[in-house]
């Protein structure tokens, strides 16, 4: 929940603190236990709410893994609709890219293959629909594979994560990204130089952001450990308009 939102008129009793692992660092935030969320005609009880001070005009809150992990759901970018399914009625979608999920630092990871400078890497990356990035390689992965300095960055990005810390990314081009049975060529990605937070972690190789993920309608079945990706009408959307101008 975003306490800075002008629509935050709720009154919640925060009863503990938890560590928030952001992309560029960590911080302690307030937590409230045993809350209820109404979504459409569904009422979900026993949820923990967190207070994360995003900028006031961003959003009122973020639906996180504590909810998403309880129900199969679909993010349909074609219709801009979120579908939440009862487990008893959920049928995995057909004709999609089905990827097995693993976990690190409490977040879901998927396998992808990336070619950089004609070198092929099999990576496990976090799926982060809250990120506006494309694909960032974590700092330890970049260092271990001696990637920093192998390309002249076409831009430098300075990012701020939910913990309010900042970091720097060197934007470069990846020759190819393979996701399931689909290949994407000359993809703008980044080498991380961040020294704290998720993007400095050795527990995963990188982060796949929503600038890539939005090209698929996404079905998440976290209880059974699968993500299903279906190409949508954003599949050929430019990653960054300034690269084609």
Regions found by a protein language model. Give the residues of each.
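Pepsin/retropepsin-fold aspartyl endopeptidases
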Residues: 1-245
């Amino acid at each position: 929940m975003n306490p800075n939102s002008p629509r935050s008129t709720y009154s919640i009793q925060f009863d503990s603190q938890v560590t928030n692992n952001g992309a560029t660092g960590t911080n302690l935030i307030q937590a409230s236990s045993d809350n209820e969320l109404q979504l459409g005609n569904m009422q979900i009880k026993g949820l923990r709410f967190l207070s994360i001070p995003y900028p006031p005009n961003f959003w009122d809150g973020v639906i996180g893994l504590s909810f998403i992990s309880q129900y199969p759901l679909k993010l349909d970018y074609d219709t801009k609709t979120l579908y939440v399914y009862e487990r008893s009625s959920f049928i995995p979608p057909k004709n999609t890219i089905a990827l097995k999920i693993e976990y690190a630092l409490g977040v879901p990871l998927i396998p992808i293959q990336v070619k950089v400078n004609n070198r092929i890497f099999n990576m496990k990356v976090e799926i982060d629909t809250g990120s506006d990035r494309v694909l960032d390689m974590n700092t330890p992965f970049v260092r271990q594979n001696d990637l920093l300095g192998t390309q002249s960055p076409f831009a430098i990005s300075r990012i701020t994560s939910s913990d309010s810390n900042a970091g720097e990314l060197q934007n470069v081009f990846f020759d190819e990204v393979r996701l399931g049975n689909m290949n994407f060529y000359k993809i703008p990605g980044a080498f991380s130089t961040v020294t704290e937070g998720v993007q400095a972690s050795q527990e995963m190789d990188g982060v796949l952001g929503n600038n890539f993920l939005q090209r698929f309608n996404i079905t998440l079945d976290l209880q059974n450990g699968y993500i299903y990706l279906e190409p949508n009408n954003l599949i050929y959307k430019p990653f960054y308009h300034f690269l084609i101008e």
